[in-house]
Structures are given as structure tokens and as C-alpha cells.
Amino acid sequence: MTLHEPLGLIDAARELRGFQAEPAQMRAGAPGKVGRLRLGFSLRDGRSVLHDLYRAAPLLVQQALYWDEAMPELPVCPIISVGGGILQGDRYTIDIAVGEGACAHVSTQGANRIHCMDANYASQHQTVTVAAGGYLEYLPDFTIPYRGSRFLSRTDLVVAADATLLYGEMVLAGRKHHHVEERFGFDLLSMDVNLRRPGGHKLVAEKILIEKGDPTIAFAAVMRGFDAFANILCVTPPETAARIKERFEPHFPIEAPRALSGVSRLPNAAGLMLRAVGVETYDVRHEVRRFWRIVREEARDRSLPAEPYWR
């Protein structure tokens, strides 16, 4: 199977030079190891619908659901991984497009597990496009890189000036309750995000790169005492961003903090960034939901329902 062009470009990333050996079980990018997903949402007869759906295992979306009681017009699409996690040699592409005036929520059925590896790596390329007046919440669950894993994710965001995108990356530093060497025991975690306007004007570029043995993760201002973190981008018009920032209260308890969080402005008046760290995933998730609720209220005048019991 021919690789999606951006996936082919990922192979040349500097941090992947030491992980080019082919897996013994099945070569990298072989049929069955290239997952593809394309979702297109549009406004039809006053209702946002999933009008375009293409999927190739192990990525799967069945249909749009309308189960958000606080925002019943919102189509919700959970991404299902039928493979039970990401393996060495896997290559994923995800393309999400929200048309003019439409809205959508895309999430995952559970954590994104990056399994142990002894050869090669896994990679993912995402393209997210939100047209004029559109609204998208793309909030995948936590990524959990197992000991010895290598994962690179590249995300391109294309957002119109009057649209709103809430995009999140949340990470747990390994199976912390499984083995003492699991915490930051992965070989490589590389995640970069590039944001631009439909005309091509570049607004924001950010990259998180954690390689095995990196001493900076233990710094007091980084991850000392914490095992989970989240970076949540809110790309929205400046006036909406100002209202959100005014309402969100940073969380910096002095004694025995379970979580820390704060919001900063993105360059080029592109919106806001929430950064949160926590002891457990639910500590970070709580901070993300605080921010998410305010974003939805200010951007769409809708509330956020109570978190499901299964969470």
C-alpha cells in the first residue's frame, strides 16, 4: 500500500534515524498496518451532519451520534481502534474537515496505547480543517507510550479567522502502575503541531520531543512530581479568546498539588493554549474540562454536560 505523502516525509525526521530497522513480524507500512480515516462535516438543512466518511482498519468510525444533551445539534464521532493500540511499523493518517457554519466533536473510545517495540517506530499524520464559522472539538483521550516505544505524530491545523477549534494532546508517561521502569521509559515521543490560515499564513508551530534519558523531564518546572500532562489549543477569534482568558482561573495550589494549570496567549492573536500537569489522568482531565466548558460557553453559547460515569 502506498503511504500517504506526509507519512513518507515523516520517515526523514531526525529523531527517527536510529529506528529504521524493519520488524521481524511484518514490514513497516505493510497492508493492514496503514490506518486511514477521513471525516467531513457540513451544514445541511440547518443541521450539522457527517457527510463524508472513509475508514481503513485499524481506524474505524461507524456513524455520527447526537448524544450531547447540552448541545444536541453536535454530531459526535468516537474513533475506534480495532487493533487495540499502536504497534511497531504502524502508520496512521487522520483527516478531519468541518465545513462553513458546521460543528462537530471527535474523540477516541479510550486511551491511545503505544505498545512496546523492538524495531522501527509508529507514526501518525493528522490534518484538521475548520472553515469559516465552523466549530470543532477534537479531543482524543490520553496517549500512553509503553516502555521501549517510539511514536511520532505530526498535526497540521487549518482554521479560518472566524472559526473555533479546540484541539488537545494529553499524555500519560507510561503505564506507571505496571512497572517501575515504565515512567518515561519510552525511547521516543515526538509531537508537533502547525497552525495556519486557509490562505497559507502560518500562525503557530510547536513541538514536544522527549527522548529516552532526557534529564529535563525531572526538572521542577517540567514534570517533577507529575506523570500526566495536556496541551490544549483553542484557536478562536481574539474577542472570544479574551473572554475565555478572563474567565479561566489558573490552578496553582501551594501544598501537595494534584494538578497545575494555566492559560497563555498564542502568537499572532491565534487564540489560547492551556497547559496542565497532574499526578493522575483524572487530575489533568479535570483541568481540561474546566477550560473546555468555558470555551464552549463563549464560542457557542452552550454548556458542557456532566462527565459520563464510565470516565
From Swiss-Prot:
One MF term in the entry's GO annotations: nickel cation binding
Is the keyword Cytoplasm in the record? yes
Coarsely, its chief localization is cytoplasm
Taxonomy, superkingdom: Bacteria
- GO cellular component entries: cytoplasm
* Assembly description: UreD, UreF and UreG form a complex that acts as a GTP-hydrolysis-dependent molecular chaperone, activating the urease apoprotein by helping to assemble the nickel containing metallocenter of UreC. The UreE protein probably delivers the nickel.
Query: Which family would the database say this protein is a member of?
Result: Belongs to the UreD family.
Instruction: Give the function comment from the record.
Output: Required for maturation of urease via the functional incorporation of the urease nickel metallocenter.
State what protein this is by name. Answer: Urease accessory protein UreD 2
Q: What is the lineage of its organism?
A: Bacteria, Pseudomonadati, Pseudomonadota, Alphaproteobacteria, Hyphomicrobiales
Q: Which gene encodes it?
A: ureD2
